[in-house]
Amino acid sequence: GKPFYPPPIYPEDM
């Protein structure tokens, strides 16, 4: 759910 690249993995992304 973060606009960064490479995208870090957070629970909110799932």
From Swiss-Prot:
Expressed by the skin glands. GO terms for molecular function: hormone activity. GO terms for biological process: defense response; regulation of insulin secretion. One of its GO terms (cellular component) is extracellular region. InterPro entries: Tryptophillin. Its main location: secreted. Keywords: Amphibian defense peptide, Secreted. Belongs to the frog skin active peptide (FSAP) family. Tryptophillin subfamily. Stimulates insulin release. This is Tryptophyllin-13. It comes from Bombina variegata.
